Amino acid sequence: MDRRARLDGYGVHSQFKTVRTEPLPLHRPRSSLGCDNIDPLGITGTPVIDPSTAAIYLNAAVAEASGPWHRVFALALQDGAPLPGWPVDVTDALRSAGKKFNARDQNQRGALTILDGTVYVPFGGHYGDCGDYHGWVVGVGTTNPRRVTSWSTDARGGGIWAPGGISSAGGELFVATGNTFGASTWSGGEAVVRLAPDLHRSTDKRDFFAPPDWQALDARDADLGGTNPIPLRIETHNGVQDLILALGKDGRAYLLDQHNLGGIGGSLVAQRVSSGPIRTAPASYAIGGDAYVAFQGPGARCPPPAQHSELTVLKIGMGEPPRMTTAWCGALGGVGSPIVTTTDGHSDPIVWIAGAEGDNRLHGFRGDTGEPIFIGGGSNEVMTGLRHFQTLIATENRLFVVADGRLYAFAF
């Protein structure tokens, strides 16, 4: 997890013409928590923008005399002012629905998602797994904040903490859950779970996947929760095939049928793809009829000469079952999260990643071959204050990297 929180809201014009600051009471000290490595705690999950409401939505950990709270804010893009009816206190909203949400033990790390007029917020636990936390998804209506829905894991634990948060495809939501504690039967952890927009979860095996050794993964803290599920589409002889890729802290990749996740042990392909834990926000792109997925992690099957690299790119293509191979690996030092840019939405993909907490440089690679096209430049282009899971923001002609008290921009 990031060791520093965002305590204020900043709005920056992409050409650096204006900078707006919206100070908000959005932090709570670690002393108010049972454990964690962030002090103070504030906004640690990536916010989401809804152009239809001209607002940005975020979750913040707030400390008050009555205790710690999680609140979901909606701020106007124009001036950062809170919208009417916001913020929504998660504990109070769920109590009204007859559910118990322990704000002290829950943390919010994953990116927020908007689908069909609802903002969805994932929750997990703190670093150290203290307290009675569960994996939660809470949905709040973007234009009616009193409309609140939720889903949570049955067992303690099962946090939804991956930096990439919640994925959506085909009008449905997909989350990856972490390790549970004391579960003798599967209770929602170590899994990819499909949720309807109203956050109903079917018990049909078509609507969840867990590895066959989920109990062993629980015991080793080697769960699926470190990476969000990635929806993919590949071309086949008969048309297209919709898939989900899940990546585990045990270094394995699980390829799933998006329309039939398979239940316990029901993956189409399970393959060791990393020699270390995978904890990142992956990026996907298409070349021809194949899907490519880039993730930060040391590839287990890197083609020569790029062995022992920290960026791995998988290629998923047509087959029975689909073929999954390591396309290429990129050399860098650091633990950022990749993004992909193209010239028109699909052509000339470039994979970008920051060497956070490593070489602290920006790296760019051709998406098809892995050829390096930018390797950080001179000494004046080393960035300070980068943190693990660091991602980038792309606009039409710039890449932005946010660091501790700094904003870096790179021109295309």
Describe the predicted segments one by one.
Residues 1-236, 241-263, 277-302, 309-314, ...:
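Mobile, glycine-rich extracellular loop/lid and propeptide segments
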Residues 269-273, 298-303, 325-331, 379-383:
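Short, contiguous acidic/charged loop-to-helix segments that flank catalytic cores in large enzymes
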Residues 268, 307-342:
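A beta-strand-loop signature enriched in Asp, Gly, Thr, and Trp
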